[in-house]
Amino acid sequence: MGAATFGLVPYIALAAEGNYEAMVLSCIDPRMQEPVHKYNVEQNLTGKFSQFVIAGAAIGVVAPAFKDWHKAFWDNLGTTIQLHHIKRVIAIDHRDCGAARIAYGEAKVANPQVETETHKAALAEFRKQVGERHPQLGVETGLMALNGKLEMFS
């Protein structure tokens, strides 16, 4: 039984352990699956990254409202560092995020300017926490529009 039997497109499978580029953190929102995938392809990350998907992306990792989830992310990040020797973490939050509303309230996402500031603050906190726990990693953070346009923050 070959890959064609199952209608699968063959691809090069790398070893579970090795040297990979990054972990990509993104949101569970179904609207963001294709834009995030497209970004990864454009960044030449296909087959070179591990992925962690959680409601809110960085918000799910740092917001007190989701504190029970935090350990799962940090444990997974530690595992991908150990197994994949990643060099950086890429956190992609997105606009119109329901988890942001749950975590911070409607007023914190009431208009695009306020929404941007809310995400910038969460992404800055995420960057800070990664730096404290894993100072060897680079951290890239951004806010993606529903159309896939990504605004990066440093």
Predicted feature locations:
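Divalent-metal-activated hydrolytic enzyme cores
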Residues: 1-11, 16-22, 27-36, 57-73, ...
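A short beta-strand-loop structural module common to alpha/beta enzyme folds
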Residues: 47-57
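Short, ordered loop/turn segments at secondary-structure junctions
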Residues: 94-96
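Donor-sugar nucleotide-binding helix/loop cap in glycosyltransferases
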Residues: 91
